[in-house]
Curated annotation (Swiss-Prot):
PROSITE patterns: ATPASE_GAMMA
Membrane-topology annotation of the record: Peripheral membrane protein
Subunit structure: F-type ATPases have 2 components, CF(1) - the catalytic core - and CF(0) - the membrane proton channel. CF(1) has five subunits: alpha(3), beta(3), gamma(1), delta(1), epsilon(1). CF(0) has three main subunits: a, b and c.
SUPFAM superfamilies: ATP synthase (F1-ATPase), gamma subunit
GO cellular component terms given for this protein: plasma membrane; proton-transporting ATP synthase complex
Known function: Produces ATP from ADP in the presence of a proton gradient across the membrane. The gamma chain is believed to be important in regulating ATPase activity and the flow of protons through the CF(0) complex.
Protein name: ATP synthase gamma chain
Length: 296
């Protein structure tokens, strides 16, 4: 049976840990509100941007003048994986789930005989992927000093990716991030950004026809799309960063809440054990006193 001093020290230690996890939970809750608002405010702009580009892509189709970012370079051999994770841990399975999704995709591509290159955003993803894919890592984006994500951060990443594409370093680019659903639900998501893919191209085209509105583009649809696509890619990356940021805070808030609850349960168990041990010591001392009195 543990002695009373050890139990008392353990209770004090767990109480101290509970204070830390509770404080982290409250900080994450405050950050989550801001991050969630930012993600929700960015969604309408991203959706409208995609709708505009989708309509243009439908009009341009596979014509000879189609932008390279839409048509691709005609190859599908080298794939760039942009994996977005957090700079810090203590957020449950937030980092591991997105890394797992990237790993599955990487293994699928390697199994098909293709080449992969990995660009990591966030320290935790780099640490995990370096164990198995060190030779495939080509770059890392450190956001540890960024207090509040801005469009400039996404534009910087987009510029790097676009430059690599222009230099024919890869053929296809996919971003991996967690899409925010709720505090307890973050969805690992993979989105191809180069060549640009629009799931609802036909639907968008039908909608524009049904509306009866005709648009004329100057100098041409191809030229407008050529100018919009880099901005669209930057917007996709920005949206992914915001979704990832909200997901991280939600995951951390949930993880710290669970840790606080577990610490409370442990304190209760240790307190019961302490009281039982103390009761046993007192009972033993009383027996010794009574035995001594009877001996006299």
């Amino acid at each position: 049976m543990p002695n009373l001093k050890d139990l008392k020290n353990r209770i004090a230690s767990v109480k101290s840990t509970r204070k830390i996890t509770k404080a982290m939970q409250m900080v994450a809750a405050a950050k989550l509100r801001r991050a969630q608002e930012a993600a929700e405010m960015a969604r309408p702009y991203a959706e409208k941007m995609e709708a505009v580009m989708s309509g243009l892509a439908s009009a341009v189709g596979n014509s000879e003048g189609a932008p390279r970012l839409l048509a691709g370079n005609g190859k599908d051999q080298v794939h760039l994986l942009v994996v977005m994770t957090a700079e810090r841990g203590l957020c449950g399975g937030f980092n591991s789930t997105i890394v797992r999704k990237a790993r599955v995709h990487a293994q699928k591509l390697l199994g098909e005989g293709k080449t992969i290159k990995i660009l990591t955003v966030g320290k935790k993803g780099r640490e995990q992927l370096r164990r198995d894919y060190a030779d495939h890592l080509i770059g890392h984006v450190d956001l540890s000093d960024v207090k509040r994500l801005g469009y400039a951060d996404a534009a910087s990443i987009a510029t790097d990716v676009l430059n690599r594409f222009e230099e024919d370093e890869f053929d296809v680019a996919t971003i991996f991030f967690n899409r925010f659903e709720s505090v307890i639900s973050q969805i690992p998501t993979a989105t191809q950004i180069i060549p640009a893919v629009f799931e609802d191209v036909e639907e968008a085209d039908d909608t524009s026809k049904d509306s009866g509105t005709l648009y004329e583009y100057e100098p041409s649809e191809e030229a407008v799309l050529e100018d919009l696509l880099p901005r669209g890619i930057a917007t996709q990356i920005f949206t992914a960063l915001l979704e990832n940021g909200a997901s991280e805070q939600g995951a951390r808030m949930s993880a710290m809440d669970n840790a606080t609850r577990n610490a409370g349960d442990m304190i209760d168990r240790l307190t019961i054990e302490y009281n039982r041990s103390r009761q046993a010591v007192i009972t033993s001392e009383l027996i010794e006193i009574i035995s001594g009195a009877e001996a006299l």
